[in-house]
Amino acid sequence: MGKYFGTDGVRGVAGADLTCELAMKLGRGAAAVLTGSTGHRPRILIGKDTRQSGDMLEAALTAGLCSVGADVESLGVLPTPAVAYLVKKYNADAGVVISASHNPMEFNGIKIFAGTGYKLPDEVENEIEKHIDNNCADIPLATCAEVGRVSVRADGLDDYVDHLYEAIHGDLTGLNVCIDCANGASAAVAQKLFPRLGAKCTFLGVSPDGANINKGVGSTHLDNLEKAVVAGGFDCGIAFDGDADRCLACDELGQEMDGDKVIALLALAMKEKGRLDGDTAVVTVMSNLGFIKYMESQGVHTEKTAVGDRYVLENMRENGFAIGGEQSGHVILLHHATTGDGELTAGKLLKLLAESGKKMSELNGIYAQYPQVLVNVTANAAQKAAYKEDEVLAGFIENEQQKLMGMGRVLVRISGTEPKIRVMVEGQDLEAIDRCAKRIVERIEQRILKQ
């Protein structure tokens, strides 16, 4: 991670950490790095989620881009994966998404896609950061007719829905589904796509007001969806986050289906049809041991990366694998998309359910998960830095790992998108791992929270 860019773009509290000044510099730096050698007037797409701060940041970002001669096409509110798809379809030089994904509304973020539709590699982000630190002093400003123009593009929604419809290529007739759009960017797409595929749909979280994105709804608040599914007698529930790059589900009994379960089901379906390249699924170190063991028993190898869908994608592209993702619900289907796409994932999962003739609870029960305890410790940048340098703390955590005697594992990591240190302990004995997690959290708080 760099000074400004985390694992998923630049992110922070809008107006405090992520200011208009920073957004403008980011626009200038990105335009210079991404389009400096194109030899033509660059075109940049901008999409956003439903946060109140999105308009403010889009205006600042647009000013930065236009000030160095780039034309901007505003797509309005669209999911992150829609921008990734459209930047390539429209032959644009880059695409920018203004969103903080699953975070509360006070946060916002800026993530950038190259003209290929893929997120920027670390080295390109580092070049942009150098320009920001230099106040973009070495980037010439456009004048007169060289200044970029701004236009609104209204066809993005329908073009993206058409793409998803063709990629899913399924008939969902007979399914009764409850879909939670998190009061975010997925609402317009979902309300067009899933009924078109034949599903009977009831929608939650489709009334964004700028402040209610992810507020008690969406993939980070599944309890409301789970209750609604049981009370309404739905076949299953689907939940997206604020920018719809992730998808979680629940079965008809209200039981959660995390990203591991979704990846397992889709990967095995692909394997059965001969489409699972390398018979491999790429996941992160957070994936459940029950998932890993089950996939191995089914002849599917699992590649494990650091946490972050960008690292999953890098492994997939380097090795030619077709599916990967995270327990949190990011699922990348590389035959159809260049990034995690919640609505594509949901469509593929619902197609599998419709074709199986089974209940979702039967699909959800394909393997038993090992118990996991996940605790988040709030930590600012200085406290995160102190954690990384604390050898005593590292030794304590290693000792806790040894106490599990090979019957579990400990994973403590710094979040790249939130001011948190995440403590995850996994094993067969829930009481033992719960005690272990509490000891680690207590020691972290004792040693670094004074920073």
Residue ranges and their predicted role:
Residues 39-49, 73, 176-178, 279-285, ...:
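Short glycine-rich phosphate-binding loop at a beta-alpha junction
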Residues 82, 126-161, 166, 252-325, ...:
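Proline/glycine-rich low-complexity loops and linkers
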Residues 1-63, 67-68, 150-175, 384-385, ...:
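An N-terminal, well-structured beta->alpha segment
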Residues 32, 36, 40-108, 192-250:
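N-terminal small/polar loop signature for handling phosphorylated ligands or for N-terminal nucleophile
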Residues 236, 273-451:
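Phosphate-binding and adjacent anionic-ligand microenvironments
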Residues 47-48, 179-181, 251, 335, ...:
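Short glycine-centered, acidic/aromatic-flanked micro-motifs in structured strand/loop junctions
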Residues 13, 108-232:
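Gly/Ser/Thr-enriched, mixed-charge loops and adjacent short helices
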